[in-house]
Swiss-Prot record:
The lineage of its organism: Eukaryota, Viridiplantae, Streptophyta, Embryophyta, Tracheophyta. It comes from the Eukaryota. This is Unknown protein from 2D-PAGE of needles. On the 2D-gel the determined pI of this unknown protein is: 5.6, its MW is: 36 kDa. Signal peptide: none annotated. It comes from Pinus pinaster.
Length: 20
């Protein structure tokens, strides 16, 4: 499951430009 860094974000899919 991949989220836009919201709630739960995959470490490999994490984007610094998006809120955590």
């Amino acid at each position: 499951i991949i989220y836009d860094x919201v709630g739960q974000c995959d470490k490999d899919f994490y984007r610094p430009e998006l809120p955590r």
